[in-house]
Amino acid sequence: MAKEELLEFEGTVTEVLPDGNFRVRLDNDHQILAYAAGKMKKNRIRTIEGDRVVVEMSPYDLDRGRINFRHKAEGNAPPPGARRQQNFRRR
């Protein structure tokens, strides 16, 4: 299946489910089951309840989708000049 055939919708994450799945309510009031795209997992982009997301769906299965973009919330950004916390231990 080529990427041109995918449908894109915007929605809101309503529930975080086990195994990296999410319940998303689309702007047209349909509720679907979605999973995070591989690049989101690779870059450790966390998705929580209430986040605005863009979902790709196949025209053959309109009940499942892939989250490929999470919109940045305005209140979650760190202040300018703030240092990022390191995830490793210096020796």
UniProtKB/Swiss-Prot annotation:
Family annotation (PROSITE patterns): S1_IF1_TYPE
S1-like domain span: 1-72
Superkingdom, natural source: Bacteria
Subcellular compartments: Cytoplasm
CDD domains in alphabetical order: S1_IF1 (cd04451)
Location of region: Disordered: 70-91
Gene Ontology terms, MF aspect: ribosome binding; rRNA binding; translation initiation factor activity
A family per Pfam: eIF-1a
GO cellular component terms, semicolon-separated: cytosol
Subunit structure: Component of the 30S ribosomal translation pre-initiation complex which assembles on the 30S ribosome in the order IF-2 and IF-3, IF-1 and N-formylmethionyl-tRNA(fMet); mRNA recruitment can occur at any time during PIC assembly.
Functional note: One of the essential components for the initiation of protein synthesis. Stabilizes the binding of IF-2 and IF-3 on the 30S subunit to which N-formylmethionyl-tRNA(fMet) subsequently binds. Helps modulate mRNA selection, yielding the 30S pre-initiation complex (PIC). Upon addition of the 50S ribosomal subunit IF-1, IF-2 and IF-3 are released leaving the mature 70S translation initiation complex.
Protein name, entry field: Translation initiation factor IF-1
The organism of origin for this protein: Azorhizobium caulinodans (strain ATCC 43989 / DSM 5975 / JCM 20966 / LMG 6465 / NBRC 14845 / NCIMB 13405 / ORS 571)
Record gene name: infA
